[in-house]
């Protein structure tokens, strides 16, 4: 389940019209959400509040095996007042699972003015962990309709290594998206890129008027990085095929990534029936060692009809609970149940290794937002 702070950052990007699906780092986002969901650690409770249209705060307490906590604050000059009634109204807003790929968006010069956004939409985030005094911070800003720049900082006071800063610069034109990354700890430089191959067909007015958009969309991308201090390098190639809005059957996403250095190939297939169920499969294969693994995941949604707060009339169905499960040929099994109970979001999960004599891992997470 998406945390409250992640939800605020996601809404910031959404309201500033930034397409997160056009990034190479999110190429396999849907499969990762279904197959690699997080199991709560021990028992944790989180309280969050959107105190104004621009400011949010939260605190978290965790127990078992050790007692710790954190305090966080988020500020943005983007108006978030419409989130007040959505935060606890629908589990769908915090749902991390099948996310279909958005249509590539064409940015233009007066985009911020037309959407009544600030000239430089900005977000500030800070979190302090107790008692470790570990600090996290994020500064994000839209330099232009085509550019997003953000800095992530980590400070470990008890660690002698010192601070670690990650600078990320993203440039999105719709047809392609480039991402440049620099990390200070290892002086690592990285470049990512993603190209939409049938972009012209999807966005040319003449083609849109004369024929329907293609039911299939192709994307190709790459990633490469090099650590100046660590002398380590890496690279990967990837492709994505997904259904378009006029696809007559269930939506799907097919991806394939290759790491040529270690010879690792990963392919995923995800599909869903909206607001009912979702399925994902991942197959890993190494061309050097011939090792392979198959992983399957499923989601089952339960929805109920909500009543409009203003007219008391029935509205569209909203997600009230979600059951997720995964299994793999290596014997890993994970199960998670997420539900909304009034203003509380509840997550219960467990995971086990069937081929080893290991104890079950179990966790419970409560979150209250207002």
From Swiss-Prot:
Question: Which InterPro entries is this protein grouped with?
Answer: Mdm10 (IPR027539)
Q: Which BP terms from GO are recorded?
A: establishment of mitochondrion localization; intermembrane phospholipid transfer; mitochondrial genome maintenance; mitochondrial outer membrane translocase complex assembly; mitochondrion-endoplasmic reticulum membrane tethering; phospholipid transport; protein insertion into mitochondrial outer membrane
User: Quick check: keyword Transmembrane in the entry?
Assistant: yes
Q: How does it sit in the membrane?
A: Multi-pass membrane protein
Alphabetized, the UniProt keywords read:
Membrane, Mitochondrion, Mitochondrion outer membrane, Transmembrane, Transmembrane beta strand
The protein's location, in the record's own words, is: Mitochondrion outer membrane
Report the principal subcellular site: mitochondrion
Q: Which Pfam families match?
A: MDM10 (PF12519)
Q: Name one GO molecular function term.
A: phospholipid transfer activity
Q: What top-level branch of life does the organism fall under?
A: Eukaryota
Cellular component terms, GO, for this chain's entry?
ERMES complex; mitochondrion; SAM complex
What's this protein's family per the entry? Belongs to the MDM10 family.
Q: How does it assemble?
A: Component of the ER-mitochondria encounter structure (ERMES) or MDM complex, composed of mmm1, mdm10, mdm12 and mdm34. Associates with the mitochondrial outer membrane sorting assembly machinery SAM(core) complex.
Task: Tell me the function of this protein.
Answer: Component of the ERMES/MDM complex, which serves as a molecular tether to connect the endoplasmic reticulum and mitochondria. Components of this complex are involved in the control of mitochondrial shape and protein biogenesis and may function in phospholipid exchange. mdm10 is involved in the late assembly steps of the general translocase of the mitochondrial outer membrane (TOM complex). Functions in the tom40-specific route of the assembly of outer membrane beta-barrel proteins, including the association of tom40 with the receptor tom22 and small TOM proteins.
Record note on domains: Lacks alpha-helical transmembrane segments, suggesting that it resides in the membrane via beta-sheet conformations similar to those predicted for other outer membrane proteins and porin.
Q: What is this protein called?
A: Mitochondrial distribution and morphology protein 10
Give the species this sequence originates from.
Schizosaccharomyces pombe (strain 972 / ATCC 24843)
